[in-house]
Amino acid sequence: YPALEYAHLPLVLGPDKKRLSKRHAATSLEEYKDMGYLDSAILNSLARLGWSGGDKEVFYMDDLLKDFNIKDVQKAGAIFDITKLDWLNAQHLANLSLEGFKEHIKPFAHKIDIDINDHPNTDLLIASMRTFENTLYDIARALRPYFMDVGEYDKNAIDKFLSNGTKVLEDIHELLQTISHWNEEEIDVMLKEYQASNNLKV
């Protein structure tokens, strides 16, 4: 029989450069899936451990089959960074079609008793919230208030937090009229600038 071909892969280390363990982060891939990370983002993150694809950061399986070369994998330990996985997952989520995103968010919404179709403007709501967090689980949690029946209001809380609300809404309404390109990025920049200039807390 011909000799087997094999290669050594670098150890996966935590941010402290010690061997990755549960005290650093989850060590089971299933745990990451349960937390709302896409399979493609997890694969992307694993492939990038110890391997550089140049300036390109986001890879899918087809990209890896074409670009990955075991000879380019470094020998030194590779550091796993959860913030990088968060970023990659956000990119993969953003690249999903709206229908694809809805299919992926459904099981996470179901876990917290939400039926995403039980809303008069489901597509608009999902489209506006899909980049709000980095994982499907966190996005589902962020959607929850939109599916809750509001009971009694706390008047003291209203007086405390919404006393200036009308002016803020009027200001933002005027600023929205000045946006030249109506897209999420420009709206987000405008809101953050207004928040900073008026010392508003989220």
Please give the residue ranges for each predicted region:
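Small-residue-rich helix-loop
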Residues: 98-200
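Structural motif
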Residues: 32-40, 75-81, 115-125, 195-202
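Alpha-helical recognition segments enriched in aromatics with Gly/Pro capping
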Residues: 1-92
